Curated annotation (Swiss-Prot):
Activity-pH behavior: Optimum pH is 5.5-7.5.
Gene expressing this chain: glo1
Organism: Schizosaccharomyces pombe (strain 972 / ATCC 24843) (Fission yeast)
SUPFAM superfamilies: Glyoxalase/Bleomycin resistance protein/Dihydroxybiphenyl dioxygenase
Alphabetized UniProt keyword annotations: Cobalt, Lyase, Manganese, Metal-binding, Nickel, Repeat, Zinc
Protein name per Swiss-Prot or TrEMBL: Lactoylglutathione lyase
Biological-process GO terms, alphabetical: cellular detoxification; cellular response to osmotic stress; glutathione metabolic process; methylglyoxal catabolic process to D-lactate via S-lactoyl-glutathione
Catalytic activity field: (R)-S-lactoylglutathione = methylglyoxal + glutathione
Family note: Belongs to the glyoxalase I family.
UniProt enzyme class: lyase
């Protein structure tokens, strides 16, 4: 086994969220958005399952690529029996005092047509194109009220085709962008774009692994949102989706060429671990903690 690791091969593989009713969520993402269930693990003994969804049609960016070697995967974690509970089970990360995770984003080939299509399918919206000042983005709501941002790709087609949609990015809010960016750079990611919004007093940073594609045509991006001034607050500002009784968002996951070498490198860099490879029964995965205590899973490419 090689003792080195090549960060240029790393992928931002997936984003995990917990869902109340798996059947309802699978139907939403596959039948409405056209995603494909590319893998599923059921743990009867522990009473939960993991379902991995991706855009995988003939025109998809990562069509047919092995699960661990691709980007743009959505992992749905389902704990048996939650669908029988009354009311919402999970938090979406956008309401105080449990803000943290913000949204996932799908880029589309014609945003007006895509939004009209989603409305025809009965999809609820947090923000329609016509709402507010920003007429070029919309936010749909999934069955658990997680936000799905909709943004145009670099080229607009005459009519939206769900087979061209891409799982572009995942957004989390960060207290202080400097240590957060430094952390993700130690994972091999780079800031590929930055957008300041003086009126709203926030900045968005987009990080990713190397690619020649325009930002809106890619998959596997991480968006860090910094609300100006939070870095001056004492203690944690955001909820990571995993701590305490109220859960929702789980983690992002990077896949690496050599997990032993990668974790050794991360440890040498002083990055904190939630779970080291040697911890627990699962010796083939690790979890890092970023500066806001968000979990970052590490898996090996097959």
């Amino acid at each position: 086994m090689a003792s080195t690791t090549d960060m240029s091969t790393y992928k931002l593989n997936h984003t995990m969220i917990r869902v109340k009713d798996l059947d309802k969520s699978l139907k939403f993402y596959t039948e409405v958005f056209g995603m494909k269930l590319i893998d599923q693990w059921v743990f009867e003994e522990n009473e939960f399952s993991l379902s991995f969804l991706a855009f995988d049609g003939p025109g998809a960016l990562n069509h047919g690529v092995e699960r661990s070697k691709r980007e743009g995967i959505l992992e749905l974690t389902y704990n048996f029996g939650t669908e029988k509970k009354e009311g919402p089970v999970y938090i979406n990360g956008n309401t105080e005092p449990k803000r943290g995770f913000g949204h996932i984003c799908f880029t589309v080939d014609n945003i007006e047509s895509a939004c009209a299509y989603l409305e025809s399918k009965g999809v609820s919206f947090k923000k329609k194109l016509s709402d507010g000042k920003m007429k070029h983005i919309a936010f749909a709501l999934d069955p658990d009220n997680y936000w799905i941002e909709l943004v145009s790709q670099s080229e607009t087609k005459p009519k939206a085709n769900i087979s061209n949609f891409r799982f572009n990015h995942t957004m989390v809010r960060v207290k202080d962008p400097e240590p957060s960016i430094a952390f993700y750079e130690k994972l091999g990611m780079k800031v590929i774009d930055k957008a300041d919004h003086p009126n709203g007093k926030f900045t968005n940073y987009f990080l990713a692994y190397p690619s020649d594609l325009p930002r809106h045509d890619r998959e596997g991006l991480l968006e860090l949102t910094h609300n100006w001034g939070t870095e001056k607050e004492s203690g944690p500002v955001y909820h990571n989706g995993n701590d305490g009784d109220e859960k929702g968002y789980g983690h992002v996951c990077i896949s690496v060429d050599n997990i032993n070498a990668a974790c050794s490198k991360f440890e040498a860099e002083g990055l904190p671990f939630k779970k080291k490879l040697t911890d627990g029964r699962m010796k083939d995965i690790a979890f890092l903690l970023d500066p806001d205590n968000y979990w970052v899973e590490v898996i090996e490419q097959k």
